[in-house]
Amino acid sequence: MNYAGRMNSFIFKGQNVLDAIKAYRETKGMTHLEFNYPEHIAGYDLEEIKKAMGDLKVNGFAVRWRNFFLNGDLTNPDEELRQKAITMCKEAADICRELGGSVITLWLENDGFDYPFQMDYEYCFKQVVEAIQEVADYAKDMKISIEYKPYEERNFALIDSTGMTMYL
């Protein structure tokens, strides 16, 4: 049986990613790790991470967009930022692949709205479909997982349910 741990669960105050990997290696039954991109990779050499992992394998990477994407990740009205979000997905796929993983999880945390008519729903939904298709075409060997949270970070997520996720 495989047992994976998310990196955030083991990074305590004053610790770093390498400390968390060590803690996971010492956890009986742990077989796989799940990283957030870019936060768990930034500032580290991949060879350093591979060495720290030892026998542990990578299940996948979850892409996490942060503060400068507050107006949208894959739906950002600033096309440069939107393209940066898509590029981050591709980078996560490359690193996941290099570390032996096979799943990219996308939480569209900022793709949604806080009040009615804040966005052009049809246009933004089309943007999400096109962006995910671009990532899927780029990483054909990867599984793409959509993590939806109906009311996070926005009051209303654009992709807010299993049904909407399947509709993509």
Placement of each model-derived feature along the sequence:
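N-terminal pre-domain/capping segments
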Residues: M1-E91, R97
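Active-site acidic/histidine proton-transfer and metal-coordination neighborhood
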Residues: L74-L168
